[in-house]
């Protein structure tokens, strides 16, 4: 009952909600991004074995962001978070040239899942502050993003530690809500 009333007020006040699944390979910066958005500061992180979930407010949208660990042994568990996901944030370590193909394979596998067929995709090309980082155009090519035809997608260059690009990514997601 309480949830129904809060949703009614949210709709009357123009407040919207979006369920986001944030995934990517281990050490890509997912947890750092989540807490930079939530708290506005850098937090010391350890590898995420399960998940972190936080609500991030941006403009009139309440994003519920599920940050799920990216270690290879726990990636099969990602599927348990797919239900009701409206947006996917796939975080890529722009400096990790050795694993960009692995990142592409994981993303393509996810995008083939029926439960995610209606989810929009935001790729965050993270760690742009590092000197050897691939730019967004190079990551777009290496991740095969131009071949995605069945959903809206966007790539944003980011630096989780400074916050550069994070709100531009949220801006794109916020424009997708209700489309």
UniProtKB/Swiss-Prot annotation:
One of its GO terms (molecular function) is GTPase activity. The keyword 4Fe-4S does not apply. One of its GO terms (biological process) is cellular response to reactive oxygen species. The keyword Endoplasmic reticulum does not apply. InterPro entries: Arf1-5-like, P-loop_NTPase, Small_GTP-bd, Small_GTPase_ARF, Small_GTPase_ARF/SAR. One of its GO terms (cellular component) is plasma membrane. Keywords: ER-Golgi transport, Golgi apparatus, GTP-binding, Lipoprotein, Myristate, Nucleotide-binding, Protein transport, Transport. PROSITE patterns: ARF. GTP binds at residues 24-31, 67-71, 126-129. It is found in: Golgi apparatus. It comes from the Eukaryota. A lipid is attached at residue 2 (N-myristoyl glycine). Its main location: Golgi. GTP-binding protein involved in protein trafficking; may modulate vesicle budding and uncoating within the Golgi apparatus. NCBIfam families: small_GTP. PANTHER family: ADP RIBOSYLATION FACTOR-RELATED. Belongs to the small GTPase superfamily. Arf family. This is ADP-ribosylation factor. It comes from Candida albicans (strain SC5314 / ATCC MYA-2876). The gene is ARF1.
